[in-house]
């Protein structure tokens, strides 16, 4: 057993020989006879504590994270008490196992990312919409798309709920292998900063990486904007990425240009010029039906109607357009199908009354960062004839620094604000709201209704048919997390219920 893997560089090749094993997993509860169990030291718990469980459930081989980089890849003495010979299970410790896991899973699942076009989208906001637009567009042109991200993982239109935007290194490779098996030839994948910082996508072969924007988020994890930006940039400079598309209207993208000389740039500034290949909007007209967009590009010019609302969605659709053009798609075919692209669930989604009563317009959006809330309210204002109301809260156990910032934005851009619960999780709802309230210049004008359904009901009851209500923060989510329990809750369902009364 000692020095079973004498050279660290042989690890992936060795894993390829394990293909006859049924599966590899990080969860000891999912282990069955003959499986490969990965025991990682995680951020919340140490998977090595469950090695005994995995052995008892029939694991054939266990890779366990070594205590230090200097540890040899060998049977560690701390596991000797498990009587491994009797159980015919090999336990091997591996230095930097978390960093290597993506490559190990890539070998185990026969490099699925090389068998389809893989596009990675990263940024604070816009990842989901851009990914969904890419998948839709590819399908409209006769392809077979899959998506991975916040809404879920699966073939486009058949997504299954995902716990994280970017799953574990094993889950990502498992999903890609399944997509290939199901006939997908294209995958649009949201890539989170957590996923990048934790090496979950390290071995993926990206045909294209897209950067949407960067603003404050996840500082509870990254601690600084600089660290957050560095995690995002890994998709462009540290991984196997063949081409890049950047939102040139974001300052962070400008900072990256010297390091990405071949990047394709997207801008909504008609005066934008660049030596890079580009796509830019030259004219945009907004209406309740969406937006009319004229553009120029290195591939030619065109115009089309988009069903999506908001200036930020003009950026998202142009990022998708630039991405597909970069991959060699035909401009004329893209323009001809652009008007068929549908809005994304929970992204500036219109909610209508079941009856034809005169009721306010309600938009549900996932905006849960200061930048996203600002852009959503600015977009909503374009469609508001009367007053603009905003219903929002902030998630518990997450970056608390953004709470007063979102309050300031809501107060500045909306005519009326109701503060309510988002997903309080294990944090006290009163503490969350108190921190939000610190951002209001005139807190006496702000209504606080902790119960989210009652907050939505109040907004609809007191709004006129000329008014618009933006319900922000949860978007596509059909649950509310209170404590550690997920309760069924849908902003769309609740809004539709009270609009129809």
UniProtKB/Swiss-Prot annotation:
It catalyses: UDP-N-acetyl-alpha-D-muramoyl-L-alanyl-D-glutamate + meso-2,6-diaminopimelate + ATP = UDP-N-acetyl-alpha-D-muramoyl-L-alanyl-gamma-D-glutamyl-meso-2,6-diaminopimelate + ADP + phosphate + H(+). It comes from the Bacteria. Its main location: cytoplasm. Coiled coil: none annotated. One of its GO terms (molecular function) is UDP-N-acetylmuramoylalanyl-D-glutamate-2,6-diaminopimelate ligase activity. Carboxylation is probably crucial for Mg(2+) binding and, consequently, for the gamma-phosphate positioning of ATP. GO terms for biological process: cell division; cell wall organization; peptidoglycan biosynthetic process; regulation of cell shape. Its cofactor is Mg(2+). Its EC number is 6.3.2.13. It is found in: Cytoplasm. The modification N6-carboxylysine is found at residue 232. A motif (Meso-diaminopimelate recognition motif) lies at residues 422-425. Catalyzes the addition of meso-diaminopimelic acid to the nucleotide precursor UDP-N-acetylmuramoyl-L-alanyl-D-glutamate (UMAG) in the biosynthesis of bacterial cell-wall peptidoglycan. This is UDP-N-acetylmuramoyl-L-alanyl-D-glutamate--2,6-diaminopimelate ligase. The gene is murE.
């Amino acid at each position: 057993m000692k020095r079973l893997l004498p050279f660290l560089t042989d690890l992936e090749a060795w894993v390829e020989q394990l293909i006859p094993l049924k599966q590899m997993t990080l969860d000891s509860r999912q282990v069955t006879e003959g499986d490969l169990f990965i025991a990682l030291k995680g951020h919340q718990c140490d998977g090595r504590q469950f090695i005994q469980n995995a052995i008892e459930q029939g694991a054939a081989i266990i890779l366990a994270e070594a205590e230090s980089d200097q540890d040899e890849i060998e049977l560690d003495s701390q596991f000797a008490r498990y009587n491994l010979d009797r159980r015919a299970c090999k336990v091997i410790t591996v230095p930097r196992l978390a960093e290597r896991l993506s490559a190990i899973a890539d070998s185990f699942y026969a490099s699925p990312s090389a068998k389809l076009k893989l596009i990675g989208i990263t940024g604070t906001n816009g990842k989901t919409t851009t990914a969904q637009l890419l998948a839709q567009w590819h399908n409209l042109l006769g392809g077979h798309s899959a998506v991975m991200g916040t809404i879920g993982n699966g073939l486009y239109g058949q997504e299954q709920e995902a716990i994280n935007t970017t799953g574990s290194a094993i889950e990502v490779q498992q999903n890609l292998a399944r997509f290939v098996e199901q006939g997908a030839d294209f995958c649009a994948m949201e890539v989170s900063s957590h996923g990048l910082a934790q090496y979950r996508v390290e071995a993926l072969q990206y045909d294209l990486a897209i950067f949407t924007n960067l603003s404050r988020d996840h500082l509870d994890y990254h601690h600084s904007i600089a660290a957050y930006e560095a995690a995002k940039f890994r998709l462009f400079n540290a991984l196997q990425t063949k081409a890049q598309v950047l939102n040139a209207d974001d300052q962070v993208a400008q900072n990256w240009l010297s390091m990405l000389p071949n990047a394709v740039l997207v801008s909504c500034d008609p005066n934008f010029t660049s030596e890079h290949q580009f796509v830019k909007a030259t004219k945009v007209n907004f209406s309740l039906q969406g937006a009319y967009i004229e553009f120029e590009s290195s591939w030619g010019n065109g115009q089309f109607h988009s069903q999506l609302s908001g200036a930020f969605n003009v950026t998202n659709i142009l990022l998708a357009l630039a991405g597909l053009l970069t991959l060699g798609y035909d401009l004329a075919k893209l323009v001809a199908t652009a008007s068929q692209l549908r809005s994304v669930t929970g992204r500036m989604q219109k909610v209508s009354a079941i009856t034809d009563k005169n009721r306010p317009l309600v938009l549900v959006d996932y905006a849960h960062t200061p930048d996203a809330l600002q852009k959503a309210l600015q977009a909503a204002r374009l469609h508001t004839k009367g007053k603009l109301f905003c219903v929002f809260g902030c998630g518990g156990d997450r970056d608390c620094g953004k709470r007063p910032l979102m309050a300031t934005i809501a107060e500045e851009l909306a005519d009326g604000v109701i503060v309510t619960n988002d997903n309080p999780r294990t944090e006290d709802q009163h503490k969350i709201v108190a921190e939000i309230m610190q951002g209001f210049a005139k807190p006496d004008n702000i209504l606080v209704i902790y119960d989210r359904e009652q907050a939505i009901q109040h907004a609809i009851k007191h709004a006129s048919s000329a008014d618009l209500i933006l319900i922000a923060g949860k978007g596509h989510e059909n649950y509310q997390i209170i404590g550690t329990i997920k309760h069924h809750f849908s902003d769309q369902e609740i809004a539709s219920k009270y609009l129809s009364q």
